[in-house]
Structure formats: C-alpha cells, structure tokens
C-alpha cells in the first residue's frame, strides 16, 4: 500500500479550541467549512461536540452533512444561500443563515417560514466581498427586525488584514462596523483567528476560529500556544547515490554539487503537495530536517539524505510537528489553507 498518511490529532484540536475560547471569551464558533480545512468536518465536529458553542460552514451541503451525522449545535451558514429555494433547507435543518446582499434579504423576508430563524447580518466594513455597506446596514437590520419570522440578529463582519497587524485595516474596519451598527441591539461577531490572537477590541459576543483551530498561526511561523492537528507523512521507497553534476527530475532544475545520497518519497502534486515547491523546501526524515531537491513530480519527489539519515522504508514528515506547514507554504508561494485543503490519495488516521 502506498505509504502516504495523514494523521489528525483530535486531542490537539480540542486543546486549540480551549485556548482560543479562553482568549476570546464569550462564545466561539469552530469553522469547519471545506471539510474542516481538509481535516474531516464530521470527525472534527464530533471531537469538539462537548466544547464548541457552534460550528460554521460555507455551504448548505456542508451544514446538512453535519446535521445528518448527528450534530445538534448551532450551525452558521457563512455565505448564506445561493438561491432562494435553499431557505427551505435552512429551515428544515435549523441553520443560521448569513445575509450579505439585497436579494438574500428580500428572499428571506418574502418567504413564509414555519418557525423563526436566527440571522447573521453581514456588513462590508472594508473587505468588499459580501455584506451591506455601513450606510445601508441599518435599513437592512430594520427590515429583518420587523419580520415576524426573524428570531434574532447577529451583526457581523470579516477582516481583510487581521493577519497583518501593521496594515491599519483592522482598526479602520472596526471603526466602520461600530459606526454602522451604532444603536442596533443584538450580538456581534468580528474576530477571526488572527483577531482572536492579536486584537482584543475585536473580541465581541461570538468569535470564529478557523486556521488557528487547526494549530496554525495566521501570522506565519509557529505559535507555542497552538498544536498542529494535521501531520502529513510518507516513506522512502528508493535511494541511490548520485555523482557530482547530476541533474534531478523534470526540467533538470537541480544539479548535485558533490556526491549526493538521495531518497525517493511517495508524494507528489497529484496528492496535493505543491508542484511549485522549490528545491530546499523542508522535510524531515525520522525527525531530522533535510530538503526537497529537484522538481516535484506527479507521484513522487526526491529528497537529500546525509550520511547519518536512515533511508529505505523510513518515515518522512512533509508537515506537522518538525516541519511547519507555514514554512512549506511560504516556500511554495501559497498559504497553508491551500495545502491542507488539497490533500488527496492519502490514508487518514484519527488519533484521539
């Protein structure tokens, strides 16, 4: 069997939730959209079932999957519905929909609901994706408030640069949000992972923990308070010694400078490892750091082995405990979200 493995450490997930909940105060949503960032939404949700105040997903299907698996917690639909008919499933599965534009608002208001619904009303405080502009927000709020079908309203927005503390954008967005919601009663939600960790003023009634929930710092590098949940590993299935000036891999992008011992490992871009990861991207053999050399192939890649490192059959960590996923992402010119969400053809093992 091909030895590409993903370990999901559910104990680390629970640890991270507790840390983030303590930092934020109030209530905390565990964001499990995109199959919990590649970790497995149902397994992660059940691991957090006795801790989490609620969960957040992106699509109706993600919410339904949690409900049908037995999750009874509040589930926020962060993008709302994509067509008016989806409000039927919102009601059937007791989801809390976000409303971030005029047609979503109107479709909700004209529908005859059999039971009341809790709405998350989104403001565009400066990111300019979805949400009502600050000057339109009060009127959208008032329309919902007047509806007999709306149980309560959570006012929320999303930060564009909370992971860039020196940008000043988070302060600008908080000011816009506070001005646009002035005098409007109800709960609020502003803090994503970066704001939970670094912006106390953004910690309102509800936090939304995404990346940090999975043990990854949104600021790059590591964070000693968090424990990585995902560990991706494989094994060396071939090794050889190459002479000086030997090219390696497609495109001959790397030449050995001396006699070099190399290992072939079972992971490539078809498995989700980024093809654009350059030579020198870190991996670890039995806990000792080394590097990728040559171009990443579809099903395999080459790593350098020194004289002290074990070879054939030994484990190689691609990211997890020794290799920080942020380092891999930075080398490949991408972000850890993309790496985790792209994993395929691997065996998943869940460790309590």
Swiss-Prot record:
Q: Residues bearing N6-(pyridoxal phosphate)lysine?
A: 33
The chemistry this enzyme catalyses reads:
L-alanine = D-alanine
Which is an annotated Pfam family here?
Ala_racemase_C
Gene that codes for this? alr
Q: Which SUPFAM superfamilies match?
A: Alanine racemase C-terminal domain-like (SSF50621), PLP-binding barrel (SSF51419)
Active-site residue list: 33, 250
Name this polypeptide is given: Alanine racemase
Q: Hey, which pathway is this one from?
A: Amino-acid biosynthesis; D-alanine biosynthesis; D-alanine from L-alanine: step 1/1
Residues engaged in binding substrate? 129, 298
Its ancestry begins with:
Bacteria, Pseudomonadati, Pseudomonadota, Betaproteobacteria, Neisseriales
Q: In UniProt terms, what function does this protein have?
A: Catalyzes the interconversion of L-alanine and D-alanine. May also act on other amino acids.
Origin organism is Neisseria meningitidis serogroup B (strain ATCC BAA-335 / MC58)
Stated EC number for the protein is 5.1.1.1
């Amino acid at each position: 069997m091909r030895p590409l493995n993903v370990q999901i450490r559910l104990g680390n997930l629970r640890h991270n939730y507790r840390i983030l909940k303590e930092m934020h105060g109030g209530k905390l949503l565990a964001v499990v959209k995109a199959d919990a960032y590649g970790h497995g939404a149902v397994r992660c949700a059940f691991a957090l079932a006795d801790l989490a105040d609620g969960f957040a997903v992106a699509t109706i299907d993600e919410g339904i999957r949690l409900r049908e698996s037995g999750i009874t917690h509040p589930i926020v639909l962060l993008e709302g519905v994509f067509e008016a008919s989806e409000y039927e499933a919102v009601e059937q599965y007791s989801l809390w929909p976000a409303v971030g534009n005029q047609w979503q608002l109107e479709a909700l208001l004209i529908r005859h609901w059999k039971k009341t619904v809790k709405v998350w009303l989104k403001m565009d405080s400066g990111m300019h994706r979805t949400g009502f502009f600050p000057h339109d927000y009060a009127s959208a709020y008032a329309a919902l408030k007047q509806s007999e079908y709306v149980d309560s309203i959570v006012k929320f927005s999303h930060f564009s640069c909370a992971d860039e503390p020196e940008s000043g954008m988070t302060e600008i967005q908080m000011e816009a949000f506070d001005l646009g919601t002035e005098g409007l009663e109800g709960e609020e939600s502003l803090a994503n992972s970066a704001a939970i960790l670094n912006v106390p003023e953004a910690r309102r009634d509800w936090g939304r923990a995404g990346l940090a929930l999975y043990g990854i710092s949104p600021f790059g590098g590591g964070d000693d308070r968090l424990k990585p949940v995902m560990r991706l590993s494989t094994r060396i299935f071939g090794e050889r010694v190459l002479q000086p000036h030997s090219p390696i891999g497609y495109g001959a992008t790397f030449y050995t400078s001396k006699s070099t011992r190399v290992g072939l490992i079972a992971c490539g871009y078809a498995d989700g490892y980024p093809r654009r990861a350059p030579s020198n991207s870190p991996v670890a053999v039995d806990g000792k750091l080394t590097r990728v050399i040559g171009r990443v192939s579809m099903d395999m890649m080459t790593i350098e082995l020194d004289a002290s490192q074990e070879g054939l059959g030994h484990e190689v960590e691609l990211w997890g405990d020794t290799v920080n996923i942020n380092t891999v992402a930075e080398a490949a010119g991408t972000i850890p979200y993309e790496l985790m969400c792209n994993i395929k053809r691997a065996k998943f093992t869940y460790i309590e």
